[in-house]
Amino acid sequence: MSNPRRLARRARMLRWLLNLYPPYLGAGIRIQHIGADMRTARVRMKLARWNRNYVGTQFGGSLYSMVDPFYMLLLMEQLGRDYIVWDKAASIDFIAPGKGPVYAEFHVDDALLDEIRQQTANGKKYLPRLQVDIRDGAGELVARVDKTLYVRLKPQARQA
């Protein structure tokens, strides 16, 4: 893991780059916050003409897109270069129509990092399942996304 200043700079740069990413710009997705310690993120998507579906609510593909990379990115930063981290699978459960701006918050804590390190210490893959809720401005649940990640300690980092 990087030193705190370097990590904070990386967080600011990542937020800036993602906010300029054309698919996010086009969908009205904004990264509002990435924690200086790269353990948290908050993403917002407004409802606009170009991201509405046929019935005038948030397009489901955009709802998924707004949450797609964040657990992978946060874990990559926390675990460091000795680990392989990939998105493996995802599912989204649409609970209620998104009729306005929606938000998602991501949190990576010590317990998750410790579990991943313990499960991968022997060089085997680990498939943590993480969940993120997408909520509207009133805090009502709009969708729930389940993500499965693939995490493995790189061969050169394994103990003999």
Locations of regions flagged by a protein language model:
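Non-catalytic linker/capping segments at the edges of enzyme domains
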Residues: 1-42, 160
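Short structured motifs
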Residues: 26-31, 88-94, 115-117
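Hot-dog-fold acyl-thioester-processing enzymes
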Residues: 50-70
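Hydrophobic beta-strand-centered segment that forms part of the acyl-chain substrate-binding groove
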Residues: 74-111
